[in-house]
Regions:
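Elongated, mostly alpha-helical coiled-coil "stalk/stator" tethers of large membrane protein machines
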Residues: 1-179
Length: 179
């Protein structure tokens, strides 16, 4: 995330915290992130040099006024005006990260070869909470390439204990060992 985009997310979250609107701002930015992802034409229009600032602001008002918190809409307009709107997905991720830090939430992406049972999910969640002292929020993914085991990703850290990793290590060992 660029320094400018980080500055925007820090400022918006700080303001939202002052007025007690953290949950609303988080919810709105997450919904907008989905909208921008699902409608790439919107980003194309907002980054176009052929469309005036005023027209972009009018478009944002028409699409989002009354549907998102006024601070979020103002930030969108500012990012458009400053030519930083391409950083909007990173901005939204920054808001989510600040919220998680503020509320003591550990966001963990869990990748397994097949879906975990409810019991496995609950055990993993409870164990992560015991270790971290934070509330664990799990995002579950399946990747058959794992073969077995789990890969956990959180706060820029990746912990992999998958059968695929073990097989890869064994392969390297065999290749580097001379007979």
């Amino acid at each position: 995330m660029s320094d400018k985009v980080k500055c925007y997310s820090d400022a918006l979250y700080s303001l939202a915290k002052e007025v007690g609107a953290c949950e609303e701002v988080l919810d709105d930015t997450q919904k907008l992130a989905v909208s921008f992802r699902d409608e790439p034409e919107l980003m194309r229009v907002l980054t176009s040099s052929e469309i005036s600032r005023g027209e972009k602001r009018d478009l944002l008002d028409a699409c989002f006024k009354g549907r998102v918190h006024s601070y979020v809409l103002s930030c969108l307009k500012l990012m458009c005006d400053q030519g930083s709107i391409k950083g909007f997905p990173a901005f939204c991720a920054g808001i989510k990260q600040l919220y998680n830090e503020d509320k003591g939430i550990l966001a963990v992406t869990v990748t397994s070869a097949r879906p975990l049972s409810e019991i496995q999910i609950e055990r993993l969640k409870r164990r992560l909470e015991e270790i971290s002292g934070r509330t664990a929020e799990l995002t579950l993914q399946c990747d058959s390439a794992c073969i077995g085991g789990l890969r956990l990703e959180y706060s820029g850290v990746s912990v992999e204990d998958t059968l695929r990793r073990r097989l890869d290590e064994l392969k390297k060992l065999i290749q580097t060992t001379s007979v």
